[in-house]
Curated annotation (Swiss-Prot):
This is Type II pantothenate kinase. Its EC number is 2.7.1.33. ATP binds at residues 6-13, 99, 121-125, 137, 225. HAMAP family: Pantothen_kinase_2. One of its GO terms (molecular function) is ATP binding. Gene3D superfamilies: 3.30.420.40. It catalyses: (R)-pantothenate + ATP = (R)-4'-phosphopantothenate + ADP + H(+). It comes from the Bacteria. The gene is coaW.
């Protein structure tokens, strides 16, 4: 059996290949000892690691794994997934939305990291808890899916009420900027969480398309564990990218790019 592992700050992503089949699974990083014990009880042909906690795993297992830089591993894995899913693009920006977000430019041969922001899954969970007292990520994102941002976020259409705006009316003028205009309203947890995810999605997209413009490409690829069970984040990112005139790509199993790429480096 061949195993690639991306041991991140929040999640451990695992890719297994055996008998020409591929399997994906995740574990919380808090369960890293469980992963170590599992590896020590498996017959493994190839083991390759990446991510911030790769060294922790390597120090406690009986095997001799190879360790790769996570940026290179993610780029290689993404290249494989793009090809398998029929996306033939030569150069693009990709945003890896994990606990935070890292941005990379791929020129058809090599990747280079071109930026990063602190908005990502960590902000969704942390700010989400402060707004709702919910700690479970799946419960939080499920509730956010039912939220309405219009009572909380100030949109361009709210400013230009009776006039045609010079830019699309659905663009956000100020995140959470509509709150003081609706103090007589009850702000539900669903609405607050939807707006929090909106902030994350719009910041990531704004950064991604700014870099895409700088590197002269229309293609922006989004991967990362923050999209797990988070259809709202995906919709915000894809819609905002299109609204700004760029072409978004959401990659199935993109969160496993690092683990898959490590396996093939």
């Amino acid at each position: 059996m061949k195993i690639g592992i991306d041991a991140g700050g929040t999640l451990i992503k695992i890719v297994q290949e055996h008998d020409n089949r591929r399997y994906y699974r995740t574990e919380l990083t808090t369960n890293i000892q469980k992963v170590i014990d599992w590896l020590n009880n498996e017959e493994i042909e190839t083991l390759k690691l990446t991510g911030g906690n790769a060294g922790v795993i390597a120090d406690q297992i009986h095997h001799s794994p190879e360790i790769f830089v996570e940026f290179d591993a993610s780029s290689k894995g993404l290249e494989i997934l793009l090809d398998e899913q029929g996306h033939q693009i030569e150069h693009y920006i990709f945003a890896n939305v994990g606990t935070g977000t890292s941005f990379h430019y791929f020129d058809g041969k090599d990747q280079q990291r071109v930026g990063g922001v602190g908005t990502g899954g960590g902000m969704i969970q942390g700010l989400g808890y402060l707004l709702s007292n919910i700690t479970d990520y799946k419960e939080l994102t499920n509730l956010a899916q039912n939220g309405d941002r219009d009572a909380i976020d100030l949109k361009v259409k709210h400013i230009y009420k009776d006039t045609e705006p010079p830019i699309p009316g659905d663009l956000t003028a100020a995140n959470f900027g509509n709150v003081l205009h609706h103090l007589d309203n009850q702000f539900t947890s669903a609405n607050k969480l939807a707006s929090a995810i909106g902030v994350v999605g719009e910041v990531i997209t704004t950064m991604a398309i700014t870099l895409a413009r700088e590197y002269k490409t229309k293609h922006v690829v989004y991967i990362g564990s923050s999209f797990n069970n988070n259809q709202l984040l995906r919709e915000v990112v894809e819609n905002y990218t299109v609204l700004r005139g760029f072409k978004p790509y959401y990659i199935e199993n993109g969160a496993f790019s690092g683990a898959l790429g490590a396996l093939y480096l």
